[in-house]
Curated annotation (Swiss-Prot):
<dbReference type="Pfam" id="PF01168">
    <property type="entry name" value="Ala_racemase_N"/>
</dbReference>
<feature type="active site" description="Proton acceptor; specific for L-alanine">
    <location>
        <position position="263"/>
    </location>
</feature>
<dbReference type="InterPro" id="IPR009006">
    <property type="entry name" value="Ala_racemase/Decarboxylase_C"/>
</dbReference>
<dbReference type="GO" id="GO:0030632">
    <property type="term" value="P:D-alanine biosynthetic process"/>
</dbReference>
<dbReference type="GO" id="GO:0009252">
    <property type="term" value="P:peptidoglycan biosynthetic process"/>
</dbReference>
<dbReference type="GO" id="GO:0008784">
    <property type="term" value="F:alanine racemase activity"/>
</dbReference>
<dbReference type="GO" id="GO:0005829">
    <property type="term" value="C:cytosol"/>
</dbReference>
<dbReference type="InterPro" id="IPR029066">
    <property type="entry name" value="PLP-binding_barrel"/>
</dbReference>
<comment type="pathway">
    <text>Amino-acid biosynthesis; D-alanine biosynthesis; D-alanine from L-alanine: step 1/1.</text>
</comment>
<keyword id="KW-0413">Isomerase</keyword>
<dbReference type="InterPro" id="IPR001608">
    <property type="entry name" value="Ala_racemase_N"/>
</dbReference>
<comment type="function">
    <text>Catalyzes the interconversion of L-alanine and D-alanine. May also act on other amino acids.</text>
</comment>
<feature type="binding site">
    <location>
        <position position="310"/>
    </location>
    <ligand>
        <name>substrate</name>
    </ligand>
</feature>
<feature type="binding site">
    <location>
        <position position="136"/>
    </location>
    <ligand>
        <name>substrate</name>
    </ligand>
</feature>
<dbReference type="GO" id="GO:0030170">
    <property type="term" value="F:pyridoxal phosphate binding"/>
</dbReference>
<feature type="active site" description="Proton acceptor; specific for D-alanine">
    <location>
        <position position="40"/>
    </location>
</feature>
<keyword id="KW-0663">Pyridoxal phosphate</keyword>
Length: 366
């Protein structure tokens, strides 16, 4: 999907806010802890290359989801460590070794496949993934991990790190969190050959469980100024939301009582009113179910009426505003604000998803 530069819909990304958010977390966690910036999914929709370059002086490395995301950073000149958090199958290892990308290994089956596909792992840096209770990828026993580490080292790999991921670090009830933490600690303590880096802290753990940090953290959503819990838990320090989303009115008209708006005729005017059309829709990540939510025009909340279309939405206006009038979908407009979390709550989802759904059809302005 190409970016649409010839329409007024844009996302503005404040890189300075991202840098300050990361600095706030770094002040909150123990000294000497390594920081990895999580820039997967195009830095949660903010632009992985631009964010990575902005954070280059502040962080020790980056986390991505897959090899393609890692290669994008390498091609952009990012030379610090890049860890792939997902599983890279052994047939892609040559490229990972050549471009000095650190991979996650999560099973003995992977090791067996590597012996067949690419038995010489010299130059490969590895982090071992532990499933402490998330139920996704990872090993579950000390014996498995010991065997995996020994096998990887025998093939020439540098087993630099070991890590896990918490399922409920952003919830008030820490029962599950503590179960996972104790599982991970016990496993680490039982290893014959412990890797140099041990990390379990995502954004939520770094904020609300900073006393449980090992020697590295992975900062994702908090870097972009959002509360990992949505609004369930209070933040110990302020954050700046880094992305705003805006457009403009491209059509304004008066409709009469009884007129309908949008697909399915789901909105019927009860009286004569002004309506405005805004060029953003579900193809941009502004989902179809946003009817009834509001955007900001001239410091006023204006309701979205009718279903959101692929490329457009329609709002009720208090008067006939001129074409080109600014419309704020995320961010501030004359002392009023719409946050990403507000949108997530309306959609019954999480703020992460709202950002990640913003398509690359929307240009990012830095």
């Amino acid at each position: 999907m190409i970016s649409s530069f010839h329409r007024p819909t844009v996302a503005r990304v404040n890189l300075q806010a991202i840098k300050e958010n990361v600095a706030s977390v770094q002040k909150h966690i123990p000294l000497g802890v390594k920081t990895y910036a999580v820039v997967k999914a195009d830095a949660y929709g903010h632009g992985a290359v631009q964010v990575s370059k902005a954070l280059l002086p502040q962080v020790d490395g980056y986390c991505v989801s897959n090899l393609d995301e890692a290669l994008q950073l390498r091609q952009a000149g990012i030379d610090k460590e890049i860890l792939i958090l997902g599983v890279l199958l052994p047939n892609e290892l040559k490229l990972a070794i050549t471009r000095q990308v650190t991979v996650t290994v999560a099973s003995l089956e992977w090791l067996a496949m590597a012996k067949q596909e690419w038995p010489d792992l010299k130059g490969l840096k590895v982090h071992i993934k532990i499933d402490s209770g998330m139920g996704r990828i990872g090993l579950r026993s000390v014996t498995e991990v010991d065997n995996l580490i020994a096998g990887l080292k025998s093939m020439g790999a540098d087993v630099e790190g070991i890590f896990t991921h918490f399922a409920t670090a952003d919830e008030a009830d820490d029962t599950k969190f503590n179960q996972q933490l104790q599982f991970f600690k016990k496993l680490i303590a039982g290893l014959e050959d412990k890797p140099r880096l041990v990390h379990a802290s995502n954004s939520a753990t770094s904020i609300w469980h900073s006393d449980t940090i090992f020697n590295a953290v992975r900062l994702g959503i908090v870097s972009y100024g959002l509360n990992p819990s949505g609004s369930d838990l209070s933040l110990p320090f302020p954050l700046q939301e880094a992305l705003s989303l805006e457009s403009s009115l491209v059509h304004v008209k008066m409709i009469s009582a009884g007129d309908t708006v949008g697909y399915g005729a789901t909105y019927t005017a009860k009286k004569s009113e002004y309506v405005g059309t805004v060029p953003i829709g579900y193809a941009d990540g502004w989902t179809r179910n946003m009817q009834g939510f509001s955007v900001l025009v001239d410091g006023q909340f204006c309701e979205i009426i009718g279903r959101v279309s692929m490329d457009q939405l329609t709002i009720r206006l208090s008067k006939a505003y001129p074409l080109g009038t600014k419309v704020t979908l995320i961010g501030s407009n004359q002392q009023k604000n719409i946050s990403t979390t507000d949108i997530a709550n309306y959609r019954n989802t999480i703020n992460y998803e709202v950002l990640c759904l913003l398509s690359d059809r929307i240009p990012r302005i830095y």
